[in-house]
């Protein structure tokens, strides 16, 4: 019955593609989308600097998590066991039949490039066509789109597409997209700037050439949520930042 009146089991069994979606679980926020076709699963980590073991209060009260993380900090885990606490790649590709636990990322192997690009395009088209409302920060959506999410999405479809295009800059070598990142950071739309900063954090210290602009955004941007993303870049890369201003940002958070 959960399939609904218009979906028959016979039609469902003909499907060879499944989309996956993850955003927020309690205070743990991440933006991950996936698509599986046949035996291959493609995962898009839009914020790859996040780790799978990102903090959740309740789970780090669990003894197993505590021990796992302690062993990681002590350097006692092997490469596979450590993956849970390390930054990810912007995209990943897994052969689910051979690797059901999604350990061996095939995304950078030449022999899988065609599969990677096909699934990347499939997922991107899906994200844009919905459109995916999570490319707006959650507080903004709650204030502006919650009353009628469908109408909000359709009215903002072109804007969401531009946000997705900005987010996708972290799929390419930094030198190839540096100028586009600069344009994003200077864009009049605050959410393009927001995603430009996330892309900078994806590239880490390689994006340091934009540091003056990032500092300017942190100090002067009109949107508090954009300032927070600028602070995120500075903190992730151990760059100088006024901690008192961080406190003010948090006090003014939506």
Segments from the language model and where they lie:
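Short secondary-structure boundary segments
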Residues: 1-13, 56-74, 181-182, 215
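Polar, surface-exposed loop/tail segments
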Residues: 1-37, 112-121
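Glycine-centered flexibility sites
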Residues: 4, 38-39, 201, 235
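Generic structural hydrophobic/aromatic packing signal, biased to beta-strands
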Residues: 7, 19, 35, 42, ...
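Generic structural signal for secondary-structure transition and capping sites
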Residues: 12-15, 40, 128, 132
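Active-site proximal loops enriched in glycine and acidic residues that flank catalytic Cys/His/Asp
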Residues: 21, 44-46, 131
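C-terminal, low-complexity/hydrophilic appendages and adjacent surface loops
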Residues: 25-108, 115
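Long, internal low-complexity/basic segments
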Residues: 75-90, 98, 106-212, 216-253
């Amino acid at each position: 019955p959960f399939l609904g009146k218009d979906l028959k089991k016979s039609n469902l069994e003909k499907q060879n593609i499944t989309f996956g979606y993850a955003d927020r679980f309690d205070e743990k926020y991440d933006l991950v989308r996936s698509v599986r076709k046949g035996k291959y699963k493609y995962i898009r980590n839009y914020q790859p600097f996040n780790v799978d073991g990102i903090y959740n209060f309740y789970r780090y009260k669990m003894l197993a998590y505590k021990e796992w993380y302690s062993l990681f900090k002590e350097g006692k885990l092997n490469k596979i066991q450590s993956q849970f606490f390390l930054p990810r790649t912007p995209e990943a590709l897994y052969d689910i039949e051979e690797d059901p636990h999604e350990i061996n990322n095939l995304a950078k192997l030449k022999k899988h490039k065609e599969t990677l690009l096909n699934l990347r395009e499939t997922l991107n088209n899906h994200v844009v066509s919905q459109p995916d409302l999570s490319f707006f920060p959650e507080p903004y959506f709650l204030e502006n789109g919650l009353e009628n999410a469908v109408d909000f999405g359709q009215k903002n479809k072109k804007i969401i597409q531009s946000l997705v295009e900005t987010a996708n800059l972290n799929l390419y070598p930094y030198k190839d997209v540096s100028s586009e990142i600069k344009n994003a950071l200077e864009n009049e739309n605050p959410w393009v700037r927001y995603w430009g900063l996330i892309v900078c954090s994806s590239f880490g210290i390689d994006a340091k050439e934009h540091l003056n602009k990032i500092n300017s955004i942190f100090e002067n941007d009109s949107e508090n949520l954009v300032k927070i993303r600028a602070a995120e870049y500075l903190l992730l890369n151990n760059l100088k930042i006024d901690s008192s201003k961080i406190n003010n940002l948090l006090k003014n958070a939506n």
